[in-house]
From Swiss-Prot:
Organism in which the protein naturally occurs: Synechococcus elongatus (strain ATCC 33912 / PCC 7942 / FACHB-805) (Anacystis nidulans R2)
Protein function: Functions in an input pathway to the Kai circadian clock. Probably senses the metabolic state of the cell via plastoquinone levels and informs the clock to modulate the photoperiod length. Deletion decreases the ability of the bacteria to modulate the circadian period in response to altered light regimes. Mild overexpression increases the photoperiod. Rapidly degraded in the presence of the quinone analog DBMIB (2,5-dibromo-3-methyl-6-isopropyl-p-benzoquinone), an artifical electron acceptor for photosystem II that reduces the plastoquinone pool.
GO biological-process terms attached to the record: circadian rhythm; detection of redox state
Domain 4Fe-4S ferredoxin-type: 88-119, 121-144
Transmembrane residue ranges: none
Name by which UniProt lists this protein: Light dependent period A
Gene Ontology molecular function terms on file: 4 iron, 4 sulfur cluster binding; metal ion binding
Residue ranges that the Swiss-Prot or TrEMBL entry lists as coiled coil: none
Positions with a binding annotation for [4Fe-4S] cluster 1: C97, C101, C105, C109
Amino acid sequence: MSASFPLEALQAGHWFKLICGASYQHLPVIRNLALTYALAGADCVDVAAEPAVVRSALAGLAAYERLTGRDRPWLMVSLNDGEDLHFRRAWFDPDRCPTDCPRPCERVCPTDAITSTGVQRDRCYGCGRCLPICPLGLIEAQAWQVDAAALLPELLDLGINAIEIHTQVGHQKEFQQLWQQLQPWLPQLQAIAISCPAHPEAIAYLWDLQELVGNTVETVIWQTDGRPMSGDIGAGTTHAAVRFAQAMLTEGPPGHVQLAGGTNAHTVAKLQELKLLAPQVSRFVAGIACGGAARTPLAELLEPLAEQQRSLEAHPEVLQAAVTTAIALVGPLKQAVGGATRSIPAFLLRTP
């Protein structure tokens, strides 16, 4: 496998990106997620723009290289040009919680980030499901913004390959300011992803950004963030991203169109049904990115190892189960477009 395989996957229409979460910083899980999805055939791993997170993801990808002798997927970090749902964490004062509270917040949290002592910040990725469910309204969201100019030099030295900019309609000024900050480092990047949530004016807004970006970046990925952070809720969450991508393919600016925000195991079938995949149409969806739908099915396998600070590859049976689960999500896109479907690596099938 060549070092350019992620770009080839984009161009061919079978790109798969694992989203670890722009605010998610549970380091042992991130390491093992990166290893698992690399083995399953992912082309890119997207993580928070924090050095410790990047190091953890790279440790998982280094384990992949050792185990397979193959080049690793790209590593991408997420930035924001202003307030954004992906860049927030829940917070509450546990001393204000009544002792007899049924604690519905704990039940709805997909990462078990909420305990009797409050929110574990490294586990919270800002999905917001706890915010409306607190009986006393004690939970609030704390937003934050990545200091791109301060962090990017170190992250590039560590070995990131790409960045993703989260933006939204009405952020032209904020995007332009961030874009100017990024100029010195753009030549070092393999790709730039621009993520925007669905909105009636989204395509016109992205055309405005295209004029600003121009030809300064060779590989641009437009991420159609249909229903942010919802892919693990149910099958129907994929529809918004599919509709947005369909509109982008016919009306949007040039570049690779990649779905996110509600993507799940049903996304590929819907894209096939609408003939949006290669080679069914001349301009096709370049790929999909999955967050909750990719992480949640692996939680029961990876969390116990994280608590014990154990590497996944030291437990072959768990690794095989994790990779099998991941292939079930990655494989359909690769198969549908004729990409190289990853089978269970031979070393995982060896019996002791």
